[in-house]
Amino acid sequence: MFPIEKIKEAKYISIDTETCDPNLKTHGPGGVRNDGHLAGISIATDNGVNDYYPIGHQTGNLNKEKVKDLMLEIFKSKKTLIFANALYDLEWLMTLDNKLKVDQNSWVYDIQIIEPLLDENNRKYSLNNLSQKYLREEKYEDQINMEVSNRFGKRAKVKENLWKLHPSYVKGYAMEDARLTLEVFKKQMARVKSDKIEDIVEFESKLIPLLLDTRLKGVRVAQDRAETLYIELKQKQELSQKILNKRASTDINVWANASIKRAYDKESIKYTYTDKGTPSFTQAWLEVQKDPISECILEIRKLDKIRNTFIKNMIMEKATKGRIHCQFHATGTVTGRFSASNPNLQQVPARDQELAPLIRDLFLPEEEEDWVCADYAQQEPRVLVHYASLKNIDSALTARDNYHQDENTDFHQMVADMAEIPRKQAKTINLGLFYGM
C-alpha cells in the first residue's frame, strides 16, 4: 500500500500535516490539549515519493493504524526530516502516537528557522514566501479555495475547513506543501554552505526537540488560587472605582479621556492637551502626578490589567489539567532571543512590589524542585555598542568605554539622558528597535 522501501532509501523526507485545529488562533495549537485532531499527513522525499495520507477527514480516509505504522517506520529510520513550522507538525504527529517523537539524536530541520539565519531582516517566512523566493513558485491554492468557498461560503478559511472536504480535493494541495518544503530546504542548504553557517544551523535545529519537550510538558499553575485571587482583585478594583466615582460625583471610565476629564475638572486639577486640543491623560503623565484622582486611575488600570491579562487570559483561560503550555519561538526576534506566545510567559509581572509576587506565586515548580532565574545583562545593547564602536561613532565609543569600566553601565539610562525622556520610555523604544519594530 505504501512505498515504504523506497521511502527508507531516501536521504531527506519532508513532512507536513493537515489538521482540525479549532482554537489555534485563540489558544495556540490544540495537539497538547487534545483539542481537535490530525486530518492527514503528506510526505515528499528526495527520491521521488510524494503522497498524502488522510486519516481524519469526514469521509474517504485511509486505515489510521496503517498510516501510523508507516510514520513509525519513517521516524525509526532516523532519516533527515524536513518541516515548515516543525513544532506545530511534531506536536500533532504525537497525537497519533507518542513514539512519533524527535530527540537530540534526530536530524530535524525547519525551513522557517533556517531562513532567519540566512536573512534576519526578511521577516516573511511563510512557505509561500519562501517558495516564491527560492523556487519562483507559489502554492497552488485556486482549486481548494474554490471548493471551500462553494461548500462553506466565501468567507470560509481554507485551513479551518480542509478536514471537512473529501481527501481527493485536498491531496494535491497537501502534496504540494511537502514538495515545496523539501525543494526550499535544498536551496537553503546550498546557501548555508556558501555562507559557512552550518554550525549555527545545526545548533538552532537541535533546539527543536528541546522546545517540543518544553511545550508538551508545560508549567504547573495554581488554578484554584488564581481564581480566588481574580475575585479578590476584582473586589479591590471595584472599591477603587467607587472612591473615584465619589470624588468625581459621577461614574468615571478610566479608559476614556472624555470621562476622565470630568473627574479632573471636578477637582480643578490641570491637565495636558494634544496638538488638536483634546484632553490628554497618558500613562507617563499620570505616573508623575501626586493627586488622588491620578492615583485612583492608575490603581484601577493596574488591577484591571493584572486580573484580565495575567490571571484570566494567561492562567484561567489557558490552563489544561493544571498546566499552561506556552509556545517558545526560537527565531521570534531579529537578535535571536526567544519570543513566546499562548501565553507569553516572558511577560509575567516582576516589578510591582505588591502584585508581582502574587502573580508569580501562581506558577509552580515541579515537585521537590525550585525555580532558577538567570538572565543576560543588556545583551542586545552590548552587541549594538560593540558593532557601532567598530564604525568609530563617538557616542558608541563612549558607551563601549563605559561598559569596559563599569559592568553595571545602564545603556537605557544613557539613551534616556541623551533624549531627555524617562528611562522606561527609552527602554521600550530601544527594545522595540532591537527586536525588529
What are these regions (language model features)?
Residues 406-424:
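Generic long, charged, amphipathic alpha-helical segments
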Residues 425-435:
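Short, amphipathic alpha-helical "recognition" segments used to contact nucleic acids or chromatin
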